[in-house]
A protein has these predicted regions:
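Short acidic/glycine- and proline-prone juxtamembrane loop motifs at membrane-interface regions
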Residues: 215-229
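Interfacial juxtamembrane loops and adjacent helix segments
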Residues: 77-173, 338, 370-387
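Perimembrane helix-loop-helix junctions
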Residues: 239, 245, 273-308, 316, ...
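Hydrophobic, aromatic-rich transmembrane alpha-helices
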Residues: 367-425, 429, 472
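Membrane-interface alpha helices of multi-pass inner-membrane proteins
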Residues: 252-268, 273-274, 306-309
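Transmembrane-helix signature of polytopic, membrane-embedded enzymes
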Residues: 161, 167, 188-212
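Membrane-interface transmembrane helices that cradle and orient dolichyl/undecaprenyl
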Residues: 196, 236-252, 285
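Transmembrane-helix motifs of polytopic, lipid-linked glycan transferases
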Residues: 171-196, 235
Length: 512
């Protein structure tokens, strides 16, 4: 009997041992299982939306797409970064042939010219795509030359998978951007659930409205580091909101630090966003020290150090190679000189708000808050050459005003709760301020000082999409209990219609 019992027990022991070994892997996926189904639905919708846009927009008609593709090509084919200090180098012969086959020079910035359509043009493009010309360029990547390398390193994977076919490479790279768009919607949902824990349905409405934004889908359906920047920014928003609501744990501090570090490695614009993120770490440090003792100051410090590591390593590398310590960012210090500071403040103010008495006129004949930031947010696609007629922008003021009114009503109804959360709201305001000042300062340097185009593109504000989702969610709650479901449904239908009409506008532009 003892032998029989041992024989029966031994398989059971092995099963228990194997299940015990499987537990760590299950624990690793436990956070994913806790994500609500609604969050995955929002992410899937954002993915499908961006993938649809990636198919609608012709090759290399995404903003600066040829430059970003050249950056990836430089990494893979030359094994180095495009950093020779020039932004006007030549693409590879193969990329030039494909661009010529697409008639890119005629189509870009020229709405009167549509994309290629005849059979002869299609055959010429196919021949150019399979010409087998050199893939080595001048070592530059146009406007993308100065950007950090992380996004482009990730895009090297689809580039290698479809090697030898630029058009297929581009499409696969666009789909990677669509995945980043899905991550943006996912983290936006999680952020809204943290700041509105008692209104999960409102969080769903806000995240869905973000997932269906045509500007997000257009940028995520293009080869552009903005797509990854939006996802990273949404993740940082979520980590900050979770820290303010539940406290900063060691795991959350590491995640927040990694998010900041990835942001620095994704795009230079994250510098402005990071200002608010570090303000958030400072506020959390003060709060945690008061509530649980100074020992917990180590957690915000840990997040800050992890986040700053890429900047420190980049500065050390440049010092060792006798470059500017912070690369292009080093030149920004001249804007803070006493003689320039007032002009900078005046320009940045007028970049977003009406001019005050005594300020120099920088935007004569323009109401920047309407003509640039609102009208171009309604629709600005392609190489800033595809937009709606002005009457559409004026009509869009009515639903925008309605959403703003409902948002204010919802905020006023919860003013006591908001007052208790002023430190957290102040951090989000610091993120907004840091990003606005960075964009405005960069535009001042380009426009006012060097007489180049201004950085007047609403896409630069899309890292703030989680806050837009919060506006939508509070607007729906502002409609009151009775009308909130109808308001939420109407909002989703409105945004979805906006997305579809925007797609039709792009189709008419390139294929009409």
């Amino acid at each position: 009997m003892s032998r029989l019992a041992a024989a029966v027990r031994s398989p059971l022991v092995r099963v228990r041992a194997s299940s015990a070994e499987a537990r760590p892997s299950r624990r690793a996926f436990a956070p994913l299982r806790r994500v609500p189904t609604a969050a995955w639905v929002c992410a899937l919708i954002a993915l499908l939306n961006a993938a649809t846009w990636s198919l609608i927009v012709p090759p290399f008609e995404g903003k600066d797409e040829s430059d970003h593709f050249a950056y990836v090509e430089q990494i893979v084919e030359n094994g180095s970064l495009p950093e020779n200090g020039q932004q006007n180098g030549n693409y590879s012969n193969q990329e030039d042939l494909v661009l010529a086959g697409l008639h890119a020079d005629e189509v870009i910035h020229s709405p009167q010219h549509t994309s290629i359509s005849s059979e002869a043009e299609q055959r010429a493009l196919i021949e150019a795509n399979h010409a087998g010309a050199s893939l080595r360029g001048s070592g530059e990547a146009g406007i993308a030359t100065s950007e950090p390398p992380l996004y482009y390193t990730i895009e090297a994977i689809p580039y290698l998978l479809a090697r030898g076919n630029i058009l297929l490479q581009l499409q696969l790279m666009r789909l990677v951007g669509a995945l980043f768009g899905a991550m943006t919607a996912l983290f936006t949902f999680l952020f809204l659930r943290e700041i509105l824990p008692r209104s999960p349905w409102a969080a769903t409405v806000g995240a869905l409205a973000v997932a269906l934004q045509p500007s997000l889908a257009f940028m995520s359906g293009s080869v552009n580091p903005d797509s990854m920047l939006f996802a990273v920014a949404a993740a940082v928003f979520y980590c900050l909101a979770r820290a303010f609501r539940r406290g900063l744990t060691a795991r959350l501090a590491i995640a927040l630090g990694i998010g900041i570090a990835v942001g620095f490695l994704t795009k230079l614009n994250f510098v402005g966003f990071a200002f608010g993120a570090y303000v958030g770490l400072l506020v959390l440090a003060v709060r945690e020290a008061r509530a649980r003792g100074r020992r917990l100051l180590l957690l915000p410090l840990l997040a800050a150090v992890i986040g700053a590591l890429p900047v420190g390593l980049y500065a050390l590398r440049n010092v060792l190679q006798s470059h500017h310590t912070l690369g292009l960012a080093s030149s920004g210090g001249s804007l803070l000189a006493p003689g320039e500071l007032w002009h900078l403040i005046s320009y940045v103010w007028q970049f977003y708000l009406p001019r005050l008495p005594g300020m120099t006129h920088y935007f004569r004949g323009l109401a920047t808050y309407k003509d640039i930031w609102f009208d171009r947010s309604v629709g600005l696609y392609g190489w800033m050459d595809t937009m709606f007629p002005s009457w559409v922008d004026n009509v869009a003021l009515f639903p925008a005003a309605l959403v703003a009114g409902l948002f204010l009503r919802g905020a006023l109804a919860r003013r006591k709760t908001l007052r208790r959360r002023l430190p957290e709201l102040g951090v989000y305001a610091a993120i907004v301020l840091g990003l606005l000042v960075l964009i405005g300062g960069s535009s001042y340097d380009s426009d006012a000082l060097n007489h180049s185009p201004a950085f007047a593109e609403p896409r630069y504000l899309l890292p703030l999409l989680p806050l837009l989702g919060a506006v939508f969610a509070l607007a729906v709650r502002g409609a009151g209990r009775r009308w909130a479901p109808a308001a939420g449904a109407a909002l989703i239908v409105l945004v979805f219609g906006f997305d579809v009409v925007s797609q039709l506008q792009v189709i008419a532009r390139y294929y009409g």
